[in-house]
Amino acid sequence: MRNTNTLIIGGGMGGLFAAFHLRSRYPNMDIIIIDKGAMLKDRKCPASMGKACVHCKTCAITSGVAGSGAFSDAKFNIGTAYGGTLSEELGDDVAMNYINQVDKILEGFSENYPKMFESNEDLKLKCVQNNLRLLDMNVRHLGTDRNAVTMQHLIDYLIDNKIEIIDHADCIGLYKPVDEYFVAEVVEHNHQYNIQADNVIVATGRGGADFVKKICNEFDIESEANAVDVGVRVEMKDIIWKEFSDKIYEPKILCKTKTFEDQTRMFCFNQGGIVSAENNRGIITANGHSFADPTKKTENCNFAILSSIHFTEPFDQPTEYAENVSRMANMIGNGNVIVQRFGDLIRGRRTNEHRLSQNTVRPTLNATAGDISLVLPHRILTNIIETIYALDKVAPGTANDDTLLYGCESKYYSLKPKHNKNFEVIPGLYLIGDGSGISRGLSQAAAMGLYVADQI
């Protein structure tokens, strides 16, 4: 049995920032971070190097120290308009205070900290005139490469300041045998042991949804299901969205579709980026990245178009629904993401290798040519097609025949357990980050870590 003052389960953005702030407040506190993935410097993904996904037991993209954000495009939203509901929990002033603290901490660990991209009124007007809503937010874009270096500096600082980080350590159970402490059952390299902790911070991210559900069952914590987002990753020539990316870097646009009046969103824009694959609990889904290094830029841009689904009673398995849609894409794609030309989709035919080889937009991901209409439900597919045509009005060329759609891209949001104002679900047990059902991005996950550290 090992003993610690504070155990942090999950070494992603929320967990690392909680540890950083705890150390600044309590120089002598014993703190342990465990993560089921590898240390950042040891996280290697064949798919990220242009090879096929080999279905690693623990995905190096979505799991490991520094979290799934380590290999993201690393866009830090300096605001509360999207990326989570932290302002609803804390009030906008308090939430912004912690988000600004995150920005300052990142600057301290970053080399050549990037400029802030600010909102643009002309682009907002252009979207409004075409029945679209451009979300207003300042953005700090580190890029996948610069973010990895920044996170490694933060990790090194924590280790140098006597915070123990244990990788390849999976928490398989959490209990509270007495009121004074918790006991975590941990498996590390097939060796099982227990850690006793006065306080526990659960920061397992979206990939830890099953663990959060297990905790709710163990401690009889009430929770509510969140929405899920299902859609595609879209790739086209970078010049089509250059007006937007030059002025605000990342356009986040909401669309109300005509047929069903559903809300879709365009987000996770990557200028000069690449489309990537990631393994979410054995399901291969699409994502996107871009780099700060100009030598790594491509002639393409990519972004997600997702349709939000809010289920009502009696259905209470939104995550399982989204996973099954993505699993169907893998079945058709022979274990891989599928890609289709927009022109082929509109004409009701699958994309084959010949048509893909003649395409003017060269795919940046080695995906299987196929037919997305065989995967996505009619309502979601209709929403996506209508959104592409709507976006074409503000960025002509978006609806070109050669635009590529990769399927599927899905965002699963964890259960939202009932908690107090300190994000405490029972005394001494805190849930933060995307695994809490509150944050949906890097900035708010990190801000939650800082906030909870102030409550301990």
Task: Give the positions of each predicted feature.
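Residues forming the flavin
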Residues: 2-83, 117-456
